[in-house]
């Protein structure tokens, strides 16, 4: 039988062995605060300038931008509240939640987690619609705002159903804890003196119809979506390069710059792919430890946090709106003469198009999206 001294020594050694895990958990918490906090500020600013600085002829496209911004904002808020740490546990999806949601309930934490996952999947569809929109503007003219609202709402209805499927399949907390204890005994998660009352939630098994549908929706469509995005991107660029449309160089440059913006936005989900790769490797036991457990969702947090930067960089009215806000703080003073010269450059009247669809395309780009 071990003496008190030996017990104390063994416990000290155990706690010492868990120090790296403690450190990585703290790093994960602070990364969540920084990344999501940054994203919340940027998306709030973007929503503000969309309402205040969107020109009349750009309103239909602003529906897509607003959809991006509002879901990115809510995703950052939900992820900050959850701050989930993935516990790779075979066929179960188990998460320890370090965010403020843990002070309310494990159900709220899982709700936030489900919202984050479904919102990121929904953003892929809005990105696809954005590329199709840009092409249709060139060949048919811009659709009206009401039509865009209907299209976006229909696509979100599909995502909302998947969200409910995923959330309703929430597992029993005690069962998930027992799975975690059995598969990860080295962490001693059952020791309250070390970990306190940890908040755990997730799916007991992924082999249920709701979970399988949700996982399929959030992972499988991304490949065909990106093929279609690439198709419409190439068609748009080839249309701009052809002589079929009678446009001024400034108008063509405007369209090309917006396509560049969408292309960069399409590259942002690389964080999702890297996170998915880490998740897969850890799920099959190829890698393990507190780094993949904490880094997976922090990488995904970078998607909604960085997305608004594309709009601010490439869309002139929003960039100007942001600079006006910053100039009021005294950090930055706007150079009126430089901005005026840029605006004057792109205010040159375009050549007359040969049909009404081309006129609408010119109006949508040259008059409202001067960059």
Swiss-Prot record:
Compositional bias segments (type: Polar residues): 354-365
Keyword hit for Oxidoreductase: no
Coiled-coil stretches noted in the UniProt entry, renumbered to this chain: none
PANTHER family: SERPENTINE RECEPTOR CLASS DELTA-1-RELATED, SERPENTINE RECEPTOR, CLASS D DELTA
Organism: Caenorhabditis elegans
UniProt keyword annotation of Nucleus present: no
Any Gene Ontology CC annotation: membrane
Lineage, top ranks: Eukaryota, Metazoa, Ecdysozoa, Nematoda, Chromadorea
Membrane-topology annotation of the record: Multi-pass membrane protein
Main location: membrane
UniProt-annotated stretches for the region Disordered: 344-371
InterPro entries, per database record: 7TM_GPCR_serpentine_rcpt_Srd, GPCR_Rhodpsn_7TM, Nematode_rcpt-like_delta
Gene name as annotated: srd-1
Cited SUPFAM superfamilies: Family A G protein-coupled receptor-like
Family indicated by similarity: Belongs to the nematode receptor-like protein srd family.
This protein's UniProt keywords: Membrane, Transmembrane, Transmembrane helix
One Pfam family recorded for the sequence: 7TM_GPCR_Srd
Protein name as catalogued: Serpentine receptor class delta-1
Subcellular localization, as worded in the UniProt entry: Membrane
Transmembrane segments: 31-51, 62-82, 109-129, 148-168, 209-229, 267-287, 295-315
């Amino acid at each position: 039988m071990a003496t008190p001294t030996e017990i104390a020594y063994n416990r000290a050694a155990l706690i010492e062995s868990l120090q790296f895990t403690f450190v990585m958990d703290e790093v994960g918490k602070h990364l969540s605060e920084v990344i999501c906090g940054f994203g919340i500020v940027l998306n709030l600013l973007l929503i503000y300038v969309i309402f205040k600085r969107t020109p009349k002829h750009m309103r239909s496209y602003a529906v897509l931008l607003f959809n991006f911004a509002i879901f990115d904002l809510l995703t950052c808020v939900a992820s900050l509240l959850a701050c989930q740490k993935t516990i790779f546990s075979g066929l179960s999806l188990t998460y320890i939640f370090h965010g403020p949601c843990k002070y309310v309930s494990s159900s709220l934490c899982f709700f936030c987690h489900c919202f984050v996952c479904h919102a990121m999947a929904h953003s892929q569809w809005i990105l696809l619609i954005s590329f199709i929109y840009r092409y249709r503007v060139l060949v048919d003219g811009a659709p009206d705002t009401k039509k865009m609202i209907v299209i976006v709402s229909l696509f979100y209805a599909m995502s909302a159903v998947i969200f409910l499927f995923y959330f309703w399949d929430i597992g029993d907390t005690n069962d998930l804890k027992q799975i975690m204890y059995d598969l990860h005994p080295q962490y001693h998660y059952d020791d309250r003196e070390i970990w306190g009352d940890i908040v755990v939630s997730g799916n007991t098994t992924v082999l249920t119809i709701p979970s399988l549908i949700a996982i399929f929706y959030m992972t499988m469509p991304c490949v065909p979506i990106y093929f279609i995005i690439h198709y419409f991107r190439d068609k748009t660029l080839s249309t701009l390069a052809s002589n079929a449309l009678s446009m001024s160089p400034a108008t063509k440059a405007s369209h090309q710059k917006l396509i560049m913006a969408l292309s960069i936005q399409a590259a942002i989900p690389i964080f999702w792919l890297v996170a998915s790769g880490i998740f897969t490797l850890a799920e099959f036991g190829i890698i393990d430890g507190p780094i993949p457990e904490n880094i997976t969702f922090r990488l995904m947090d970078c998607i909604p946090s960085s997305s608004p930067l594309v709009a601010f960089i490439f869309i002139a009215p929003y960039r100007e709106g942001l600079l006006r806000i910053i100039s009021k703080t005294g950090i930055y003073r706007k150079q009126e003469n430089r901005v005026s010269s840029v605006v004057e450059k792109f205010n040159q009247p375009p050549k007359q198009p040969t049909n009404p669809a081309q006129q609408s395309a010119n109006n949508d780009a040259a008059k409202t999206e001067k960059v």
